[in-house]
Design a protein with these regions (language model features):
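N-terminal ligand-binding lobe of clamshell/alpha-beta domains
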Residues: 27-397
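Bacterial N-terminal signal peptides that target proteins for export
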Residues: 2-14
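Bacterial N-terminal signal peptides
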Residues: 11-23
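A general, composition-driven signal for non-globular sequence regions
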Residues: 1-5, 19-22, 266
Length: 397
């Protein structure tokens, strides 16, 4: 019979208890891990909600603001400079309410090539939020992703660009999980889906009762960016909005990828029923020397309707697109380009629905939808013009 002293027995018991407690804590830690599948179909695991975040595109501030509208910048330790460069109107709104936005380190400019892994690693980040595709690092940047994850920076992929009307909801739920903001994410998703239903359901009913002609649409992307006529979107981005509302995108059969060029001769031959331009100009363009500015259409934060209309008139005049039947017949419109890369895209979908089927959607009010999105889910007020119809009478005066 083996005898164990009381002192050794106490030590043994303490050791066993410590071992068991370690096992309990390990199990609890495992159970509390955040585990999701991102939109690049990768398993992403965090031990706790992210506290030090890198934004692969600073335009994702729209999404993060939905989850934390009072303090959207609190956990951002670095970001690309695209918002300030590409959408200065919105950046200025954030700057006015949150001056500290200027102090957030920039980890690149407006491209994946400019993204600095070294800078990110110096910021002790625990999560990097990237788009599957876009201006920042994407799912194809395998070496960069590997570098970050080897250094302890978890990478999460979201998407508002490739398949926006499917992946906006998925992306917001993912962000809600990894940031510990599920309640806010669920509230947004509920509103988003309700507003999408206001397009999808009436359109399905109308088509079933009275099959309608599907309008042929030319989507003219980033008007004024280059002299060559005319850049367009064929798949994903705003082309997905057209698909959702039953528009016939004339670029689909001619452009093999997501975006490309349709020349003016083709447009004059095809003569689309509707012309929609995307506007990359901002209020800041109006402050510069207008004579030396490209013919951008100006929309977005801080832009008046009259300035938007004047810029649209100029763009049409300088591009020779005034000869399109859609323009002459009063079916020419422009919309804020950056809807394609934010969860606020549902307002643009509703706008497209009204432009294509004005009778079916006579009671739909996209501006009210956008107002609600800003009031409930954004930290800055809705202040600007985000879409406009070309005033053909003004063009003839």
């Amino acid at each position: 019979m083996i005898r164990i002293s009381s002192r050794r027995m106490c030590r043994l018991i303490l050791s066993i208890v410590s071992f068991l407690m370690f096992g309990v804590h390990a199990a609890q830690a495992s159970e509390t891990n955040i585990r999701v599948t991102d939109l690049a179909e990768r398993t992403v695991i965090l031990s706790h909600p992210a506290k030090r975040i890198i934004l692969g595109e600073s335009r994702y501030l729209f999404a993060l603001s939905i989850l934390n509208p009072d303090h959207p910048l609190d956990n951002i330790v670095g970001m690309l400079a695209d918002l300030q460069s590409i959408d200065p109107g919105t950046y200025q709104q954030y700057q006015q309410r949150f001056p500290e936005i200027d102090d957030i380190p920039r980890v690149g400019h407006t491209s994946a090539d400019s993204f600095s892994v070294e800078k990110v690693l110096s910021l002790n980040a625990d999560l990097a939020i990237f788009g599957v595709e876009g201006h920042g690092p994407g799912a194809r940047n395998a070496q960069l992703i590997d570098q970050l994850e080897r250094a302890g920076v978890t990478v999460l992929f979201i998407d508002f660009r490739n398949d926006p009307l499917v992946n906006t909801v998925k992306s917001m739920r993912l962000l809600g999980h990894v940031l510990g903001q599920n309640t806010r994410a669920d509230a947004f998703v509920e509103y988003y889906q309700a507003q999408l239903d206001r397009v999808v359901k009436p359109l399905a009913i109308a088509m079933a009762k009275h099959p309608q002609h599907s309008p042929a649409v030319f989507l003219h992307s980033r008007v004024g960016l280059q002299d060559l006529c005319c850049e367009t979107m064929a798949r994903g981005m705003m082309a997905a909005f057209l698909d959702n509302v039953g528009g016939q995108n004339i670029a689909k059969e001619r452009v093999p990828g997501s975006a490309g060029i349709l020349n003016l001769e083709y447009l004059l031959t095809e003569q689309p029923d509707i012309y929609i331009a995307t506007a990359i100009g901002a209020a800041q363009n109006l402050e510069a020397d207008a004579a030396n500015q490209p013919p951008y259409i100006v929309l977005g934060a801080g832009v008046s309707r009259s300035d938007a209309q004047a810029s649209f008139q100029r763009a049409i005049k300088e591009s020779a697109l005034g000869s399109l039947t859609a323009v002459r017949n009063g079916h020419a419109y422009a919309i804020w380009h950056h809807f394609y890369n934010t969860p606020l895209n549902i307002a643009a979908v509703q706008v497209f629905a009204k432009w294509l089927y004005p009778q079916t959607f006579a009671d739909l009010d996209p501006h009210a939808t956008l107002e609600t999105l800003y009031q409930r889910f954004q930290p800055v007020p809705l202040n600007g013009t985000y879409w406009v119809e070309l005033d053909t009478k003004a063009g003839r005066s």
